[in-house]
């Protein structure tokens, strides 16, 4: 009897112990600031918690690129507050910044004594997916510089255009660049430069510099109409200034460079073009990547795109693939290039256009390369603190030797990254940069 009573008491005791273990820890109200690594720098985020809920999130100190991370900085905090959870989808194209913001909020919850995974669990509901059918004359996939200008041109020519952008931002890598190159633009004519060189001469110089590992016909087609394209951009609100040559490394090249007049407003120029597109009747869908091309008898008949809660089936007569390259796709880079590289992208250039077009029978284009800037190797992420050492390796601060241990270039002629890759390209897969301990410590 006593044994049975003891066993019963023990069972009740275990049950009570089990219940008490599930009791949630009280989260302390307050405002918590957490600093984590972002894309370019440290990111400081302020999180306010009240009565067990996230009531405010604010990104404070940071040096993230506004044109790329701006939407993540302004919109992701609102999303976290709305869902009462840091476990929300980030902003496509600003993944690193998004992850930093979410990590900072999670750290704030932990500091307050809470469990980040328990926040929002009661209210989180999966939204129902729906299908919507649309139609257009032209679907432009990608709202970078090429996509926006293509969409606006088609809309101005009387076509009904739908523009799809996989991220929350427009501009693509065009907002990272300093400006376009052009031959025989109005500004060059005013400067007395137009007519002093031809597209064919620029092409010859370009191919020689790139060891003929490019597509000459494609380059010529672009270069031959580059002047009138720049004139068109300016007629439609973009403010460009003819510079000639920006970098000392290009002093012996052709003066083709046109810079954005206001380098702090690069995104604004493309927003102005987009506004014209929308005013003319065009429609843009953000965070809605195209996932499939439809075709019949070797002709495009439609595009399938997906947002977070809607699948769009768009019938069309033509599709413009302005998705960029594959610079943000590490697997494809290693497959095509042969080794890992960290390139300057907005994170959205993952080869979508090639993947979709090849799925319906398109051929694989020529693999081309441009010997221009040098990028970080072996996974050195910008903003990690190690990228400064990487820069010191390929800038004119050290001695370069090839695999035989011989110097192969006058390092002081490589004024910046512009000539580094061209000089190194003749040396095989890799070369060595010799630095002293003092040099490394100085950079660190």
PLM region descriptions:
Residues 169, 175-283, 400, 407:
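Conserved N-terminal/central alpha/beta ligand/cofactor-binding core
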Residues 354-356, 363-444:
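An anion/pyrophosphate-binding glycine-rich loop and adjacent beta-alpha core
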Residues 314-381:
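Glycine-rich loop(s) and the adjacent beta-strand/alpha-helix scaffold that form part
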Residues 133-136, 308-318:
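Core beta-strand elements of the Rossmann-like FAD/NAD(P) dinucleotide-binding domain
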Residues 128-146, 162:
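Beta1/beta-strand and adjacent pyrophosphate-binding region of the FAD-binding site
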Residues 23-124:
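Active-site- and interface-proximal helix/loop "cap" or "latch" segments in soluble metabolic
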Residues 156-177:
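Glycine-rich FAD pyrophosphate-binding loop
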Residues 286-299:
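A conserved short coil-to-beta-strand element within the FAD-binding core of flavoproteins
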